[in-house]
Amino acid sequence: MNIIKPLTCILAMSISGLATAAVTLHVPDDVTLFVANGQKAKLSGSLFASSKTIELPNGENQIVFQYEPYFSQGNDRIGVESNVIIAKFSANDTDLNFELPKYRDHRVAEQEIKQMQWQLVDEQGAAVTKSEDKLVKSGMQIGRDYAREAADYNQTGGIAAIGTAVSVATIKTEPVANVETKVKAGDNTAEEMLHFWYDKADEATKARFKAYINQ
């Protein structure tokens, strides 16, 4: 019986940590985020907000986006589009913001935006390491399926390619199957589960667990 209480504790702490662990990407209104990790990007935020957000998992992520700053000329607003960019990066438990070039006017933007330098920066202003490429499609550009293009790009193994969603899902569900097998197999079920979840916990969770046991 004594093993059940600490087991419940570490399970709760581990699940809580997994639920809150995420990367928040802030997307300004002059950036169109088409795809995140192979899926059409679903942003949160009010209609007229200057930026919106999307929650991404910790670890490696891939995005497809386009930058389009606008410039006033008389009564008109002129937008200048960058290339469609596919990029991958890794981050954990942080907020990220785009750091994008600013241009004096639309003429300068038209000359320079295709070779623009950009970054993703964290809460401390440090740039996140990334790999990027252009997501190029010849011919008609209207009605592009960016999710499909990203999947095709990943198959080519480009510098910004990531693994498929299927392999990620398999990795995530595998520990659950292992737990179920252990529950059915052994007489020492509680102890085995305790060891399993303790090994999976991060150092902060392990420290809290040890403090709880020593009470």
Curated annotation (Swiss-Prot):
Q: Name one Pfam family in it.
A: DUF2057
Signal peptide feature range: 1-21
Instruction: Write the record's keywords in alphabetical order, separated by commas.
Output: Signal
**Family classification:** Belongs to the UPF0319 family.
Q: Which HAMAP family match?
A: UPF0319
Q: What is this protein called?
A: UPF0319 protein VV2_0960
Species in which this protein is naturally found = Vibrio vulnificus (strain CMCP6)
